[in-house]
Amino acid sequence: MRLDKCLADCGLGTRSEVKSLLKAKRITVNGKVVTNGKVQVNPETDEILFDGEKIQYEEFVYIMMNKPKGVVSATEDNLHKTVLDLIDPLYFKKGVFPVGRLDIDTHGLLLLTNDGELAHRLLSPKKHVTKIYQARVEGVMTEGDAAAFEKGIVLSDGTECMPARLDILSTTQDESIVQIHLKEGKFHQVKRMVKACGKTVVDLQRLTMGPLKLDESLALGESRPLTEEELQSLMMNE
C-alpha cells in the first residue's frame, strides 16, 4: 500500500497532514527518511517510524465505551457533546463511528468502529442481534407485562414489536428493576414498550449487544479497545 495511506490509516492525520509530516522528514521506513507518500510499503514487514516511534498499523479499530448520559451517539452535533468527544483523538482520525445509537439519557454499552461491514451485520434487521437492557421503572412490572412482551407489545401509535423477553429482577411498592431482551431497535423502543404497560422508565442501561458484554470495570465515559476474544465473538456471531 502507499505510505501516505498507511500513515493516514494509523491516525497520523489526513492525506494533506501526512504530506506535511513527510516533507518535514519525520517519517522513516526501514531506517531511511522517506518524503514521498507514493512509496509502496508493507505495514506487516516494513519498520515505519514517526519521530523515532514505531507505528502500529491497524486498518480497523473496535472500541467498547461505557456511554454516560448527556452525550449523543453521533459523530457530530451542534448542541451536545458526542461520544467521539470522549475517545482518543487518534481513533477520531481513523474515522470511527458509533454502531447504532443510545438515547442521550441512556447509558451503558456502545461499540465504536470504522469497520462498516461489521456495523452493518450487527445492525441489520435480518440478523436479529439480541441486545439486553436493564431499566429502573416507576411502577410495578408484572408477570402479565412479561407475557405481553413475549407476545409482542403494540405501541401507542399502533406499531407492533417483535416478541421480547422481560425479566423482573426486583420490585417495591412503586418501582421495578427489570431486564429486557430485544432483537430490534425502534426509536425509544424500551421506553415505549414499558409505557404501553402503563409504567415509566426512569433509568436505562444497555448491558449487551450480541455476544459483547459491558466491561463493568469501565467507568461512565471510559472506553477501551476490544480484546481479541471479544472481537472474534462478534465476527463469528451470525
Regions found by a protein language model. Give the residues of each.
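Basic, flexible Lys/Arg- and Gly-enriched helix-loop patches that mediate nucleic-acid binding at interfaces
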Residues: M1-E238
